[in-house]
Swiss-Prot record:
Post-translational modification: Differentially phosphorylated throughout the cell cycle, becoming phosphorylated at the G1-S transition and dephosphorylated in late mitosis. Mainly phosphorylated at Ser-23 and Ser-29, by cyclin A-CDK2 and cyclin B-CDK1, respectively during DNA replication and mitosis. Dephosphorylation may require the serine/threonine-protein phosphatase 4. Phosphorylation at Ser-23 and Ser-29 is a prerequisite for further phosphorylation. Becomes hyperphosphorylated on additional residues including Ser-4, Ser-8, Thr-21 and Ser-33 in response to DNA damage. DNA damage-induced 'Lys-63'-linked polyubiquitination by PRPF19 mediates ATRIP recruitment to the RPA complex at sites of DNA damage and activation of ATR. Ubiquitinated by RFWD3 at stalled replication forks in response to DNA damage: ubiquitination by RFWD3 does not lead to degradation by the proteasome and promotes removal of the RPA complex from stalled replication forks, promoting homologous recombination.
Disulfide bonds: none
Gene this chain is encoded by: Rpa2
Cross-link (Glycyl lysine isopeptide (Lys-Gly) (interchain with G-Cter in ubiquitin)) at residue(s): K37, K38
Taxonomic lineage from the root: Eukaryota, Metazoa, Chordata, Craniata, Vertebrata
Protein's name according to its UniProt entry: Replication protein A 32 kDa subunit
Subcellular location as annotated: Nucleus; Nucleus, PML body
CDD domains in alphabetical order: RPA2_DBD_D
Length: 270
């Protein structure tokens, strides 16, 4: 899948560098000097994220952080909802169903004839690597690589990478902080932090629950979204997981059934 462009978040690569490292032919950045490596190590690595995490990231002294994890270069996986090409760039709206779609800008090399400037069509699932940016309090990504998914298992694998990478980076950051008290309950963390055993976005729902809820919210039909339509849009996800998420959201009052037991609408819908 993406192994050619990434080194995994293994103990060996993590212990040496703190995360994903540059490998030939893949997503990477120019090798920094030794001094830069020491002062900016974590920020130089490509960190798997969800859009929900990126939108909740804080910006202090030109440094983005998710909890205590410093980020700069990130990857996301989602579906293209809209694509618009201009003479110098292509702007995509990418939706991973954990939050509102995020703008992703890819600059166009007008002298390049290799096909890199081809617009990826809407409704295509892609993996994006890029730099997080903020302009007038609106976050976006400047992409240096956008590749369509060949296998929907890559979507699931990305979510697992998100959990794993932030757990490891949070742990390393905690160990590096001199005199920092250890957490009395390692299964719980501050909002936006990733020290817990279960990855939970800011609203307290799991990734699966957020994806299901956002799809139901986005459905404009008066009768709401049909369960079969939900399944077709979440092909990467087991049916049992979708059903569990729907049941949970119903029980918690986030959604309700409408014309029958297979149509659902968000309680936040207008």
């Amino acid at each position: 899948m993406w192994n050619s462009g990434f080194e995994s978040f293994s103990s060996s690569s993590y212990g040496a560098a703190g995360g994903y490292t540059q490998s030939p032919g893949g997503f990477g950045s120019p090798t920094p000097s030794q001094a830069e490596k020491k002062s900016r190590a974590r920020a130089q690595h490509i960190v798997p994220c969800t859009i929900s995490q990126l939108l909740s990231a804080t910006l202090t002294d030109e440094v983005f952080k998710i909890g205590d994890v410093e980020i700069s270069q990130v990857t996301i996986v989602g579906i293209i909802r809209h694509a618009e090409k201009a003479p110098t760039n292509i702007v995509y709206k990418i939706d991973d169903m954990t939050a509102a779609p995020m703008d992703v800008r890819q600059w166009v090399d007008t002298d390049d004839t290799s096909g890199e400037n081809t617009v990826v069509p809407p409704e295509t699932y892609v993996k994006v690597a890029g730099h997080l940016r903020s302009f007038q309090n609106k976050k976006s990504l400047v992409a240096f690589k956008i590749i369509p998914l060949e296998d929907m298992n890559e979507f699931t694998a990305h979510i697992l990478e998100v959990v794993n990478s932030h757990l490891m980076l949070s742990k390393a950051n905690s160990q590096a902080s001199v005199g920092r008290p250890s957490m009395s309950n390692p299964g719980m963390g501050e909002p936006g932090n990733f020290s817990g055993n279960n990855f939970m976005p800011a609203n307290g729902l799991t990734v699966v629950q957020n994806q299901v809820l956002n799809l139901i919210k986005a459905c404009p039909r008066p009768e709401g979204l049909n369960f079969q339509d939900l399944r077709s849009q979440l092909q990467h996800m087991p049916v049992a997981s979708i059903k569990q998420a729907v049941d949970f959201l119903c029980n918690e009052g986030h959604i309700y059934s409408t014309v029958d037991d297979d149509h659902f609408k968000s309680t936040d819908a207008e």
